[in-house]
């Protein structure tokens, strides 16, 4: 069963505090890292509060994996800007930094950043990993305006026909994760309605594509 919306915030704060406590108290480095990752994931999803400075500390830390997770979380909540993200990317210089930065830039919760991210997705010029990272960033963002998935859903068959199966699957699955938020139940219904409409109007679409869409519809019902 799901908790009522009004009861969730208190539980989230308890969960965040518990994961940090366990990360600090465990003597196992792998367990500490796992608890810290869980804490950062919770922060990315539900936002600023008493733990913001702690996340900023991880973002500036020496553990590159945790640092980029924290940077992406800060970006998704609008607590860092594009200049800060590109500075981190350029200072790192690795391929992983390129991927993380693409995710962080796409997750910035402002209209211009989202428009730029969607434009790059539609351009067809992204690598598999950067495409997935960009779509993951769009999905992770705290942006509460139009998710932009309408046009992306409309383009699914076109994208499928013009790209490899692997990239097409990344596109479709990534697009269908954008804009869903259990704290806003209407987003699930809107996506489900859009997918049903797409199925009705694309009866001749490739069978594998239709199957992926049907599977997502089933999971949302």
Please give the residue ranges for each predicted region.
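Long, ordered, helix-rich scaffold segments
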Residues: 1-221
């Amino acid at each position: 069963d799901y908790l009522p919306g009004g009861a969730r915030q208190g539980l989230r704060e308890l969960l965040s505090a518990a994961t940090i406590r366990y990360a600090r108290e465990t003597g196992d480095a792998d367990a500490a890292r796992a608890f810290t990752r869980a804490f950062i994931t919770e922060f990315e999803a539900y936002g600023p509060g008493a733990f913001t400075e702690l996340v900023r500390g991880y973002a500036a830390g020496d553990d590159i994996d945790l640092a980029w997770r924290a940077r992406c979380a800060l970006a998704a909540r609008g607590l860092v800007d594009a200049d800060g993200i590109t500075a981190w990317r350029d200072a790192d210089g690795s391929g992983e930094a390129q991927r993380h930065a693409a995710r962080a830039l796409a997750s910035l919760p402002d209209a211009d950043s989202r428009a730029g991210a969607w434009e790059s997705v539609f351009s067809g010029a992204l690598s598999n990993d950067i495409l997935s990272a960009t779509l993951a960033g769009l999905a992770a963002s705290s942006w509460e305006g139009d998710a932009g998935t309408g046009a992306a859903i409309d383009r699914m068959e076109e994208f499928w026909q013009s790209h490899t199966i692997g990239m097409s699957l990344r596109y479709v699955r990534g697009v269908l994760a954008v804009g869903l938020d259990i704290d806003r139940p209407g987003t699930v219904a809107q996506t489900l309605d859009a997918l049903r409409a797409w199925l009705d109007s694309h009866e001749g679409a490739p069978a594998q594509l239709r199957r992926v869409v049907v599977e997502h519809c089933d999971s949302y019902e």
